[in-house]
From Swiss-Prot:
Its main location: cytoplasm. This is Large ribosomal subunit protein eL20. Component of the large ribosomal subunit. The ribosome is a large ribonucleoprotein complex responsible for the synthesis of proteins in the cell. Keywords: Cytoplasm, Ribonucleoprotein, Ribosomal protein. One of its GO terms (molecular function) is structural constituent of ribosome. The gene is rpl18a.
């Protein structure tokens, strides 16, 4: 899978094709993070074939739909449990991110894993994503924002293009 652009969260439901031996096969549901619905269905069948004796050839996708965030305007802390294949083996990992949406946090996770561990998207398997309370956060990078009186410095930007335009009617504004 290529983790291109912002990933989206899909709910994919699939099952084996009904047969005389098994007329009502059980449904299997997964939360899949993928760039589009085609990749989401493909990842579903990849994971299901690892867990159960099912293949896309003798199965059907019952439902594949986009999952919308409940509150996309509220900043939340996300805990992500994942496993990934590195050059030396398979590792389990727990990571924390702050984001507005679940898919945004997972996208951050894919970018972060690529930067810190050189883990490609196809080698990463997201096992669980959960919104976690501020008092349950473990990572210092996330806990530093749990301050009600948090302050950020005002940037003082110096204009690099000083002679474009050379003559202008107002002084440069460097404080924002």
């Amino acid at each position: 899978m290529k983790a291109s652009g912002t990933l989206r969260e899909y709910k994919v439901v699939g099952r084996l094709l009904p047969s005389a031996k098994n007329p009502t096969p059980p449904l299997y549901r997964m939360r899949i993070f993928a760039p589009n619905h085609v990749v989401a269905k493909s990842r579903f069948w990849y994971f299901v074939s690892q867990l159960r004796k099912m293949k896309k050839a003798n199965g059907e996708t019952v439902y594949c739909g986009l999952v919308h965030e409940q509150s996309p305007l509220k900043v939340k802390n996300f805990g992500i449990w994942l496993r990934y294949d590195s050059r030396s083996g398979t590792h389990n990992m727990y990571r924390e991110y702050r984001d507005l949406t679940t898919s945004g946090a997972v996208t951050q996770c894919y970018r972060d894993m690529g930067a810190r561990h050189r883990a490609r998207a196809h080698a990463i398997q997201i096992m669980k994503v959960q919104v976690i309370a501020a008092n349950k956060c473990r990572r210092a990078a996330i806990k530093q924002f749990h301050d009600s009186k948090i302050k950020f410095p005002l940037p003082h930007r110096v204009l690099r293009r000083q002679h474009k335009p050379r003559f202008t009617t107002r002084r440069p504004q460097t404080f924002f």
